[in-house]
Amino acid sequence: MFHNTFQSGLLSVLYSIGSKPLQIWDTQIKNGHVKRITDEEIQSLVLEIMGNNISTAFISCPVDPDKTLGIKLPFFVMVVKNMNKYFSFEVQIIDDKKIKRRFRASNYQSATRVKPFICTMPMRMDEGWNQIQFNLSDFVKRAYGTNYVETLRIQIHANCRIRRVYFADRLYTEDELPAEFKLYLPIRGQLSTQSPAFAMTSE
Protein backbone atom coordinates (compact mmCIF):
# COMPACT_ATOMS: atom_id res chain seq x y z
CA MET A 1 0.00 0.00 0.00
CA PHE A 2 2.72 2.45 0.97
CA HIS A 3 5.56 0.82 -0.99
CA ASN A 4 5.82 3.74 -3.41
CA THR A 5 5.21 6.42 -0.79
CA PHE A 6 8.13 8.53 0.44
CA GLN A 7 8.31 7.60 4.11
CA SER A 8 9.75 9.94 6.70
CA GLY A 9 8.55 11.57 9.89
CA LEU A 10 5.00 10.47 10.74
CA LEU A 11 2.72 8.24 8.65
CA SER A 12 -0.87 7.96 9.91
CA VAL A 13 -2.97 4.87 9.13
CA LEU A 14 -6.00 5.65 11.33
CA TYR A 15 -7.38 8.94 12.63
CA SER A 16 -10.70 8.79 14.47
CA ILE A 17 -11.71 12.32 13.50
CA GLY A 18 -11.15 11.76 9.77
CA SER A 19 -14.11 11.54 7.38
CA LYS A 20 -13.52 7.81 6.81
CA PRO A 21 -11.31 6.53 9.63
CA LEU A 22 -11.63 2.88 8.55
CA GLN A 23 -11.17 3.47 4.83
CA ILE A 24 -8.10 1.19 4.59
CA TRP A 25 -9.20 -1.20 7.36
CA ASP A 26 -11.19 -4.42 7.35
CA THR A 27 -13.68 -4.98 10.19
CA GLN A 28 -14.37 -8.40 11.70
CA ILE A 29 -16.93 -8.25 14.50
CA LYS A 30 -18.92 -11.01 16.17
CA ASN A 31 -20.83 -10.28 19.40
CA GLY A 32 -19.47 -6.76 19.60
CA HIS A 33 -19.18 -3.48 17.71
CA VAL A 34 -16.89 -0.99 16.04
CA LYS A 35 -18.34 2.50 16.11
CA ARG A 36 -17.36 6.12 16.39
CA ILE A 37 -18.37 7.80 19.61
CA THR A 38 -17.52 10.92 21.59
CA ASP A 39 -15.17 10.14 24.45
CA GLU A 40 -16.24 12.03 27.55
CA GLU A 41 -12.69 12.47 28.84
CA ILE A 42 -11.16 14.14 25.79
CA GLN A 43 -14.46 15.46 24.36
CA SER A 44 -13.58 14.22 20.91
CA LEU A 45 -14.61 11.55 18.40
CA VAL A 46 -12.86 8.21 18.89
CA LEU A 47 -13.21 4.73 17.44
CA GLU A 48 -14.48 2.15 19.93
CA ILE A 49 -13.85 -1.58 19.43
CA MET A 50 -15.71 -3.80 21.88
CA GLY A 51 -16.47 -7.51 21.90
CA ASN A 52 -17.27 -10.42 24.18
CA ASN A 53 -14.38 -12.38 22.65
CA ILE A 54 -11.30 -10.46 21.53
CA SER A 55 -10.44 -13.10 18.91
CA THR A 56 -13.69 -12.39 17.03
CA ALA A 57 -13.72 -8.58 17.34
CA PHE A 58 -10.94 -6.74 15.54
CA ILE A 59 -9.92 -4.44 12.71
CA SER A 60 -7.04 -5.18 10.35
CA CYS A 61 -5.05 -3.28 7.74
CA PRO A 62 -4.79 -3.57 4.79
CA VAL A 63 -8.28 -4.72 3.80
CA ASP A 64 -6.99 -7.16 1.18
CA PRO A 65 -5.23 -10.08 2.96
CA ASP A 66 -3.03 -10.56 -0.12
CA LYS A 67 -1.65 -7.01 0.08
CA THR A 68 0.87 -5.58 2.53
CA LEU A 69 1.42 -2.17 4.07
CA GLY A 70 5.05 -1.87 3.02
CA ILE A 71 5.79 0.60 5.83
CA LYS A 72 9.50 0.82 6.63
CA LEU A 73 9.25 3.29 9.53
CA PRO A 74 10.34 1.39 12.68
CA PHE A 75 8.13 2.94 15.39
CA PHE A 76 4.48 1.86 15.69
CA VAL A 77 2.40 4.24 17.82
CA MET A 78 -1.21 3.99 19.00
CA VAL A 79 -3.17 6.47 21.08
CA VAL A 80 -5.70 4.24 22.84
CA LYS A 81 -7.89 4.24 25.93
CA ASN A 82 -7.66 1.52 28.55
CA MET A 83 -11.20 0.14 28.93
CA ASN A 84 -10.19 -2.15 31.82
CA LYS A 85 -11.05 -5.18 29.70
CA TYR A 86 -9.01 -7.69 27.71
CA PHE A 87 -7.17 -5.95 24.85
CA SER A 88 -4.54 -6.98 22.33
CA PHE A 89 -2.95 -5.91 19.08
CA GLU A 90 -0.69 -7.60 16.57
CA VAL A 91 1.90 -6.32 14.10
CA GLN A 92 3.28 -8.54 11.34
CA ILE A 93 6.69 -7.63 9.94
CA ILE A 94 9.27 -9.09 7.61
CA ASP A 95 12.95 -9.17 8.56
CA ASP A 96 16.19 -9.22 6.58
CA LYS A 97 16.03 -13.03 6.47
CA LYS A 98 12.77 -12.60 4.50
CA ILE A 99 10.89 -14.29 7.35
CA LYS A 100 7.48 -13.01 8.42
CA ARG A 101 7.19 -12.52 12.18
CA ARG A 102 4.20 -11.51 14.28
CA PHE A 103 4.39 -9.52 17.50
CA ARG A 104 1.30 -9.75 19.69
CA ALA A 105 0.95 -7.63 22.82
CA SER A 106 -1.88 -8.10 25.31
CA ASN A 107 -2.88 -6.86 28.75
CA TYR A 108 -3.86 -10.34 29.99
CA GLN A 109 -0.63 -12.26 29.45
CA SER A 110 2.01 -12.55 32.16
CA ALA A 111 5.07 -13.86 30.33
CA THR A 112 6.86 -13.31 27.02
CA ARG A 113 6.97 -16.24 24.63
CA VAL A 114 9.21 -16.23 21.57
CA LYS A 115 8.43 -18.80 18.90
CA PRO A 116 9.89 -18.93 15.38
CA PHE A 117 7.11 -16.94 13.74
CA ILE A 118 5.31 -15.23 16.62
CA CYS A 119 6.35 -13.38 19.76
CA THR A 120 3.68 -12.77 22.40
CA MET A 121 4.28 -10.39 25.26
CA PRO A 122 2.48 -8.74 28.17
CA MET A 123 1.57 -5.08 28.07
CA ARG A 124 0.87 -2.92 31.09
CA MET A 125 -1.42 0.04 30.52
CA ASP A 126 -2.20 2.99 32.76
CA GLU A 127 -5.72 4.15 33.53
CA GLY A 128 -7.38 6.24 30.85
CA TRP A 129 -5.62 7.26 27.66
CA ASN A 130 -2.26 5.75 26.76
CA GLN A 131 0.25 6.36 24.02
CA ILE A 132 1.61 2.95 23.03
CA GLN A 133 5.06 3.21 21.47
CA PHE A 134 6.33 0.01 19.91
CA ASN A 135 9.95 -0.05 18.68
CA LEU A 136 9.69 -2.71 15.99
CA SER A 137 13.36 -2.61 15.08
CA ASP A 138 14.38 -3.19 18.69
CA PHE A 139 11.86 -6.00 19.26
CA VAL A 140 12.89 -7.85 16.09
CA LYS A 141 16.55 -7.62 17.09
CA ARG A 142 15.95 -8.76 20.67
CA ALA A 143 13.53 -11.57 19.86
CA TYR A 144 15.12 -13.00 16.71
CA GLY A 145 18.54 -11.42 16.27
CA THR A 146 17.55 -10.15 12.81
CA ASN A 147 16.88 -6.72 11.33
CA TYR A 148 13.48 -5.13 10.77
CA VAL A 149 12.70 -4.43 7.12
CA GLU A 150 9.04 -3.39 6.97
CA THR A 151 5.57 -3.82 8.47
CA LEU A 152 3.17 -6.01 6.50
CA ARG A 153 -0.08 -5.97 8.51
CA ILE A 154 -1.68 -4.58 11.67
CA GLN A 155 -4.53 -6.09 13.67
CA ILE A 156 -6.17 -4.29 16.61
CA HIS A 157 -8.53 -6.32 18.78
CA ALA A 158 -11.20 -5.40 21.30
CA ASN A 159 -11.48 -3.83 23.82
CA CYS A 160 -10.28 -0.27 23.36
CA ARG A 161 -10.96 3.22 22.10
CA ILE A 162 -8.63 4.57 19.43
CA ARG A 163 -7.71 8.15 18.67
CA ARG A 164 -4.83 7.61 16.23
CA VAL A 165 -2.56 4.88 14.84
CA TYR A 166 0.64 5.89 13.10
CA PHE A 167 4.22 4.99 12.27
CA ALA A 168 7.26 7.17 12.92
CA ASP A 169 10.90 7.25 11.93
CA ARG A 170 11.87 7.93 15.57
CA LEU A 171 10.34 8.80 18.92
CA TYR A 172 9.09 12.36 19.01
CA THR A 173 8.83 14.59 22.06
CA GLU A 174 5.54 16.32 22.86
CA ASP A 175 6.86 19.61 21.52
CA GLU A 176 7.91 18.04 18.22
CA LEU A 177 4.56 16.41 17.44
CA PRO A 178 2.10 18.28 15.21
CA ALA A 179 -0.99 19.47 17.09
CA GLU A 180 -3.28 16.89 15.47
CA PHE A 181 -1.07 14.06 16.77
CA LYS A 182 -1.28 15.22 20.37
CA LEU A 183 -3.90 14.09 22.84
CA TYR A 184 -5.18 16.90 25.01
CA LEU A 185 -7.08 16.09 28.17
CA PRO A 186 -9.33 19.12 28.71
CA ILE A 187 -10.07 18.31 32.34
CA ARG A 188 -6.43 18.50 33.35
CA GLY A 189 -5.50 20.89 30.57
CA GLN A 190 -2.35 18.99 29.73
CA LEU A 191 -1.01 16.38 27.38
CA SER A 192 -1.31 12.70 28.14
CA THR A 193 2.16 11.18 28.01
CA GLN A 194 1.39 7.79 29.46
CA SER A 195 3.25 5.04 27.66
CA PRO A 196 2.71 1.37 28.50
CA ALA A 197 5.47 -0.97 29.53
CA PHE A 198 6.31 -4.07 27.53
CA ALA A 199 8.17 -7.02 28.95
CA MET A 200 10.69 -8.67 26.64
CA THR A 201 12.45 -10.99 29.05
CA SER A 202 12.50 -14.68 28.23
CA GLU A 203 10.85 -17.18 30.50
Swiss-Prot record:
Annotated GO biological process = cilium assembly; positive regulation of cell motility; positive regulation of feeding behavior; regulation of cilium beat frequency involved in ciliary motility
Q: Which residues cross the membrane?
A: none
* Pfam families to which the protein is assigned, alphabetical: CFA20_dom (PF05018)
Q: What's an example GO cellular component term for this entry?
A: axonemal microtubule
Major location (coarse): nucleus
- What keywords sit in the KW lines? Cell projection, Cilium, Cytoplasm, Cytoskeleton, Microtubule, Nucleus
Subcellular location, record wording: Nucleus; Cytoplasm, Cytoskeleton, Microtubule organizing center, Centrosome, Centriole; Cytoplasm, Cytoskeleton, Cilium basal body; Cytoplasm, Cytoskeleton, Cilium axoneme
Coiled-coil region list: none
Q: Which domain of life is it from?
A: Eukaryota
What this chain does, per the entry, is described as: Cilium- and flagellum-specific protein that plays a role in axonemal structure organization and motility. Microtubule inner protein (MIP) part of the dynein-decorated doublet microtubules (DMTs) in cilia axoneme, which is required for motile cilia beating. Involved in the regulation of the size and morphology of cilia. Required for axonemal microtubules polyglutamylation.
Instruction: Enumerate the PANTHER family for this protein.
Output: ORF PROTEIN
Give the family from UniProt: Belongs to the CFAP20 family.
The protein here is known as Cilia- and flagella-associated protein 20
Gene name, per UniProt, is: cfap-20
